[in-house]
Design a protein with these regions (language model features):
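Extracytoplasmic small-molecule ligand-binding "clamshell" domains
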Residues: 35-109, 294-298, 305, 309, ...
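Bilobed "Venus flytrap"/periplasmic-binding protein-like clamshell domains
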Residues: 43-52, 62-77, 111, 131-183, ...
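Ligand-binding cleft/hinge of the Venus flytrap
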Residues: 57-58, 71-82, 124-126, 162-181, ...
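Extended ligand-binding regions for polar small-molecule ligands
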Residues: 68-71, 75-77, 139-143, 147, ...
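Acidic, polar ligand-binding/catalytic clefts
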Residues: 71, 75, 79, 83-148, ...
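Short helix-initiation/N-cap motifs at beta->coil->alpha
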Residues: 84-96, 179-194
Length: 345
């Protein structure tokens, strides 16, 4: 019996080798990336207007941290960071719009959770902003801690993780509050400003952004309490893994670029670098782009268009911006934070 099996296996070897060879370096299959190329434009879902993250200006152009992620993807895939159509979405609309194919990718301060990924058929393409839920109160309340908020009316936006977490937090601390949910960020902030509620809760970065919209920003205080982990990042549909990989690795490329010292100011030097890890990143060695179905210089395209992660952060939300948010956990792992990305190799 064994004498018959061995020749059979030897006969199958060439076919198996061909099959494995075909599977090893298959570029991105037909799907979202092909639709984006045929259309010539990336359709990216963003917020309806959040300072520092996705903000539409008077001339109808967009800017912000999440906007730059969209532009980086467009640069990697289409070679032009300007080829993006931005679709403003409320928290309640965002995942439905993605699931129904109305947008190619969601870059809208969205928290990665089990329910959203497994329950909604979505894939979160890594974390690009480590946040946490916080509280903003009127300064004249003289409150210094969330543990002093018993009996308060709390404003929260519907369709966010904060809506459930605020009840969990106060319940766990044996405190009673009245939670009022609003359909969008604008109405939530309006309710806070007109004192329909005396507390507003959302991601801490969002509180910094929303406070700037108040007629008297100095009249509001952001408390030091952080009551949750809110890992934010871009989102794709789960039915197109090739596209998910592209979005994920563009996200990772921006982080890796900062770690490698590659920025929008030294693209030419990166292309000539003698360092193996920089050469792989730049596409000079390795031919890694074809595994994603992209040109070998895909990562450099992204960085050239919007800068590395550090540049994006500081320009939009960092200490040099209107928001002035310290990097904190969003500092590189080698600099005291927890931000890191798998290597490009």
């Amino acid at each position: 019996m064994k004498h018959r099996v061995a020749p059979m296996l030897r006969g199958l070897a060439p076919a198996l080798a061909c099959l494995l060879g075909a599977l090893t370096f298959t570029p991105a299959a037909a799907g979202t990336v092909d639709a984006v190329r045929q259309r010539g434009v990336l359709v990216c879902g963003v917020s309806q207007g959040l300072f520092g993250f996705s903000e539409r200006k008077a001339d109808d152009t967009w800017s912000g941290f999440d906007v730059d992620i969209c532009r980086a993807i467009a640069a990697a895939v289409l070679g032009d960071s300007a080829k993006v159509t931005f679709v403003p979405l409320s928290a309640s609309e965002r995942f439905t719009a993605l699931s129904e194919g109305k947008i190619d990718v969601l870059s809208r301060n969205s928290t990665w959770t089990l329910e959203r990924e497994a329950g909604l058929g979505l894939l979160f393409a890594g974390v690009n902003f480590h946040d946490g839920q916080g509280f903003m109160v009127h300064r004249d309340l003289n409150v210094t801690s969330a543990l002093e908020l018993g009996g308060s009316k709390v404003c929260v936006q519907a369709g966010t993780t904060g809506q459930a977490l605020v009840g969990d937090y106060f319940g766990a601390n044996s405190m009673t509050v009245t939670v009022q949910a609003y359909s969008d960020a604008a109405s939530t902030l309006r309710a806070f400003e007109t004192r329909e509620c005396n507390v507003m809760t959302t991601d801490n970065s969002g509180l910094f952004a929303e406070r700037l919209k108040l007629a008297q920003p100095a009249g509001a205080v952001i408390l030091p309490d952080i009551i949750s982990k809110e890992p934010l990042g871009p989102v794709t549909r789960a039915d197109d893994v090739a596209w998910y990989n592209i979005v994920k690795w563009v996200n990772f490329a921006l982080i890796n670029a900062e770690e490698l010292g590659v920025s929008s100011a030294n693209i030419a030097e990166a292309q000539r670098s003698a360092k193996p890890e920089v050469r792989r990143f730049a596409g000079a060695d390795g031919g890694l782009g074809r595994m994603l179905g992209l040109p070998d210089d895909w990562a450099l395209r992204a960085v050239a268009s919007v800068g590395n992660y550090g540049e994006i952060y500081e320009r939009n939300v960092g200490t040099g911006s209107r928001l002035g948010i310290p990097r904190g956990l969003n500092q590189l792992w080698s600099q005291g934070g927890i931000l890191f990305a798998p290597p490009v190799r």
